[in-house]
Amino acid sequence: MQEGSLCSISRKKTLDSDYVSKLKKSSEQGEGGKFIRQPNRFTTPFGDKEGELKVEANRYRLIWAPVCPWAHRSIIVRSLLGLEDVISVGTLDPVRPDKEISDWAFTLDKDNVDPVLKVHYLSELYLATDPDYKGRPTVPALVDLKTKKVVNNDYFNLTKYFETKWTKYHKVNAPDLYPIEKREEIDKFNDDLFDKLNNGVYKAGFARTQEAYNDAVINVFKKLDELEERLEHSRYLFGDKITEADIRAYVTLVRFDIAYYNAFKVNLKRLKDYKNLWSYARDLYQTKGFFDTTNFDAIKKHYHICCVPNPYKILPLGPDLSEWNTEHNRDKREYK
């Protein structure tokens, strides 16, 4: 599909008019103009107990959009743990089919249809699961191939299920991304990381008052400063091995200069202005599972076409992406 037509594809599958109206009017604004992210609707965990999702090879399809940091981290973990052969993937177009509707489309696939699920839009899967669903259809969305229904869109915990419940399918010598002796500390760290940085950039970008925007931006850069200091003392956030925390930090950092800096006005500093953070981000990017799942083109398109007024769909030329492949030296440093 040509780039110019990405925002104007026709909706080949007619959705319930009331649902479309809800999507158009969906608001995640709180008191004082603050952005309040909608809760996840499908949060059933994986496990052996009654009512929990069964761990089963080739039963689930992971729907993602390369632009979304929450979905990206699930794809990174899937790759690092070697789950590619047991969990299939469906990929959504980086540009929404209708700027006024918070939906995602399978327009990268032949005939604009996911080849396995046979749907045009992510919202079709959400409505098939819950006909009364009125929120935004979001990614990652894990779909049960037996029922063609969304069984989990809990981005905050999905990676941890892959790390702890899918171990029998992990590849030989898979990294321990969520070491049991550090889980409590990692969870506490990740909670604050999400509030101040991961979701913090969205709090800034979708703020509706100056005060809400200012508060969000200040918190974003306080957290970046904290990470900069922490990374002076270790190669990764929790020592010399990649953990769940690094993946969660990476998906925001890799989008920072190319998207958030301009689109969400988090522009006090660039990632490149931080010595440790910039080398750390390059270190992760140059690791298999990170660079091969990072789509800069998709990220740039989504945030500059769908998230800000841009009627002519003009994309910035920069930043220079070749710098992501420059030497980082974090593997050669001595840390104290």
What does each model-found stretch correspond to?
Residues 1-336:
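C-terminal alpha-helical interaction module
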